[in-house]
Amino acid sequence: MCTALSPKVRSGPGLSDMHQYSQWLASRHEANLLPMKEDLALWLTNLLGKEITAETFMEKLDNGALLCQLAETMQEKFKESMDANKPTKNLPLKKIPCKTSAPSGSFFARDNTANFLSWCRDLGVDETCLFESEGLVLHKQPREVCLCLLELGRIAARYGVEPPGLIKLEKEIEQEETLSAPSPSPSPSSKSSGKKSTGNLLDDAVKRISEDPPCKCPNKFCVERLSQGRYRVGEKILFIRMLHNKHVMVRVGGGWETFAGYLLKHDPCRMLQISRVDGKTSPIQSKSPTLKDMNPDNYLVVSASYKAKKEIK
């Protein structure tokens, strides 16, 4: 399916109110993070036996105590792997200092978090996947906290620890890539095959998201089903999966993004250019905006990025 997505009908605020639009972008960024929080909250609840939800995610973790408990729990799982003669080379097996009653925002909360981050480094978590202690304690880096926990899930999965749902989907895609060679581009006669899968939950969700809002835009941004869970989106071929039968997620690079967020970032019809002179906003009209197409007095807003603006100088 190739859908037409027009800047004329938007689910966001009017184009003339930049302040309102900025607030809308912030809400979109939070919406993009929600599936990851839900997935990790479920994972932590199962591992630690403490109820955590997406809404309470940062509040439950911000004194560092549950993270230290997570580290201790994972070490116990590593010991079980060691007993089963699985390789556990360089895995940290130590007591992690922790003040369980540390008040949120306190020095003790920062100390707990620092001890957890030190353990992560010993485990082999790359610095690029870590967050700052202040980022957790003051709730400034929810995305970085999520990415760190996902990386822990990847490492833990190697030793038999049940990983988060997103990591399971990653393994599924890796197996699919290993077992099957890339298929050739579909012929014109086969492009409509995806339309027959209307009963499929993922296909229906992809269609619904890609066609919202509907329009009659002449420059169509292509969203085309190639095979189960594999789509052509614009000029790229992407793996798309359903997380917990609820969220439509796109595998991008080494991570994940919501499908709606990906479209906001890559579909030219969903981008805005903003005048440096008067602050007025206007949609991108061309199929693929480039430097030569842009007025030097304008800059481009890419609404799915956590950096709310991209400047083209």
Curated annotation (Swiss-Prot):
Entry keyword set: Apoptosis, Cell cycle, Cell shape, Cytoplasm, Cytoskeleton, Deafness, Growth arrest, Membrane, Non-syndromic deafness, Phosphoprotein
Drop me one GO molecular function for this one. Answer: actin filament binding
Spell out the post-translational modification annotation for this entry: Cleaved, during apoptosis, on a specific aspartic residue by caspases.
Gene Ontology biological process: actin crosslink formation; antral ovarian follicle growth; apoptotic process; basement membrane organization; initiation of primordial ovarian follicle growth; ovulation; regulation of cell cycle; regulation of cell shape
Q: Which Pfam families match?
A: CH, GAS2
Record flagged with keyword Phosphoprotein: yes
SUPFAM superfamilies (alphabetical): Calponin-homology domain, CH-domain (SSF47576), GAS2 domain-like (SSF143575)
Which parts of the sequence are marked as the site Cleavage?
Answer: D278, G279
List, alphabetically, the GO terms of the cellular component aspect: actin filament; cytosol; membrane; stress fiber
Compositional bias (Low complexity) spans? 188-197
Q: Which residues carry this modification: Phosphoserine?
A: S183, S187
Q: How does it sit in the membrane?
A: Peripheral membrane protein
Q: This protein's superkingdom?
A: Eukaryota
Reported tissue expression: Ubiquitously expressed with highest levels in liver, lung, and kidney. Not found in spleen.
> PANTHER family given for it?
GROWTH ARREST-SPECIFIC PROTEIN 2, TRANSGELIN
Task performed by this protein:
Required to maintain microtubule bundles in inner ear supporting cells, affording them with mechanical stiffness to transmit sound energy through the cochlea.
Similarity annotation: Belongs to the GAS2 family.
Implicated disorder: Deafness, autosomal recessive, 125: A form of non-syndromic deafness characterized by congenital sensorineural hearing loss. Sensorineural hearing loss results from damage to the neural receptors of the inner ear, the nerve pathways to the brain, or the area of the brain that receives sound information.
What is the protein name given in its UniProt record?
A: Growth arrest-specific protein 2
